[in-house]
Every structure is written in C-alpha cells, then in structure tokens.
Swiss-Prot record:
One of its GO terms (cellular component) is cytosol. This is Probable phosphatase YcdX. Its EC number is 3.1.3.-. Belongs to the PHP family.
Length: 245
C-alpha cells in the first residue's frame, strides 16, 4: 500500500458519506501517512459553498501522526481552462485537482475536450487532472500527457473508475499511463473515496501501471516527501508540521 492518497470526498459533498475524522481514523488503521480531502468545487450542484474551502485554513496539519492536505476537486468550466476555484480559495488550499464533470462541462468532441484540458494544465492553477481516462470525454492522450509533463501537472489514475463509476475506463487509462511514461511526466493515484472505507485502495490502479511498466519513480504517492517535493516545486511553501512524515 502506498502511504499517500490524494483524492477523497467528505459529507461536505453530499453524495459522500464520511467525515474528516472518519478519514483520520481509517488512515491510522491503514498506515496512510498523508492524505488530501478534495471535495467537489462549488459549481457542482451538491458541492460545498466556496467559504468551506476558504475556512479549511483552520484545519490542523497533523492529527495523531497523520498529515492532512487541504484540497479541492475543481471543475473544468470551459475551453479556456477556467476552474471553479479562485481568489481566497487558492490562499487556503494546498492541492488543486481539476477534472471534467458532466453537470458543469458536458462532453464535447475530441478537439474541444483536449483544448479545455490542455488549457487547464497550462493555466498554472492545477496540480493534478482527475480521471483523464473517462471514456465520456475523448481526448488526444499524447498531447495531454506532453502538456502535463511540460507544466509539471500529474495525470490521475483513479481507482474508482474501475469499480464504481466511469465504466470502460481501463483501455483509456492504460493509454494515459503509457503516454505519461513516454513523456516523462507524473501520475497521481486517487482512491476517489466517497466513504472512508475505500481510502488508500489502489489495487486497480496498480494493475494499469504494471501493464505498461510504469516507472515507480514517477508515482507521486510513493512517499509523503515525494508528494511534498512535487508541490513545493510548484510553489507551495514548505509546511513545517509535515517535516517528520
């Protein structure tokens, strides 16, 4: 098991079922050292208000030896790469994930989807693109992977895509992983947990990576320090409380 999980939702996204405390308890039980809460951006119908993200600044950094990153899974809004995260929200957040969600950006043709995703990557506002292998959104995988490598943005392999949602993602995700490998980019693994019980579960992701001989040194979840080094290289100030993770 990798000790870092970068994608999960709490009861603040009302189609999810666990609290921050639930995730901390599961992290201790499963040996997770660092995790990110990434509730849906406010343009989703059941997402928290933008004040929720601003007020994450009051969260403790470490509880019982487990580090907590303040994050968001923002929505890609248009072909210009705008996301529903702005202003003071950025000041409170450590990790910005962004992806396509049908209520905010309906599936378009391959060229339009690709344009929107690459514009988001190039914006400088995002660290990870969530579930880029979603079969509802055809993209130019090679072009996206090359843009992500250029701009130091990770592409996610999402465990939930193979179990609960986005059915038919396997072939696309293998293509994504191979393209990231060839471009020299990063992948991020996400459980996309909507209940704490699936936190840290990456078994299906690892099958995808194994199938393309993906280099472990380009997986962000291998250690807290690797992930933190990545975020710091993107401009995040070092977080003193995480020094011993």
């Amino acid at each position: 098991m990798y000790p870092v999980d970068l994608h999960m939702h709490t009861v603040a996204s009302t189609h999810a079922y666990s609290t921050l405390s639930d995730y901390i308890a599961q992290a201790k039980q499963k040996g997770i050292k660092l995790f990110a809460i990434t509730d849906h951006g406010p343009d989703m119908e059941d997402a928290p208000h933008h004040w929720h993200f601003i007020n994450m600044r009051i969260w403790p950094r470490v509880v019982d030896g487990v580090g907590i990153l303040r994050g968001i899974e923002a929505n890609i809004k248009n072909v210009d790469g705008e996301i529903d995260c702005s202003g003071k929200m950025f000041d409170s957040l450590d990790l910005i994930i962004a992806g396509f969600h049908e209520p905010v950006f309906a599936p378009h043709d391959k060229a339009t989807n690709t344009q929107a995703m690459i514009a988001t990557i190039a914006s400088g506002n995002v660290h990870i693109i969530s579930h880029p292998g979603n079969p509802k959104y055809e993209i130019d995988v090679k072009a996206v992977a090359e843009a992500a490598a250029k701009h130091q943005v990770a592409l996610e392999i999402n465990n939930s895509s193979f179990l609960h949602s986005r059915k038919g993602s396997e072939d696309n995700c293998r293509e994504v992983a191979a393209a990231v490998r060839d471009a020299g980019g990063w992948v991020a693994l996400g459980s996309d947990s909507h209940t704490a019980f699936t936190m840290g579960e990456f078994e299906e992701c690892l099958k995808i990576l194994d199938a393309v001989d993906f280099p472990p040194e380009r997986i962000l979840n291998v250690s807290p320090r690797r992930l933190l080094n990545f975020l710091e290289s993107r401009g995040m100030a070092p977080i003193a409380e995480f020094a011993d993770l």
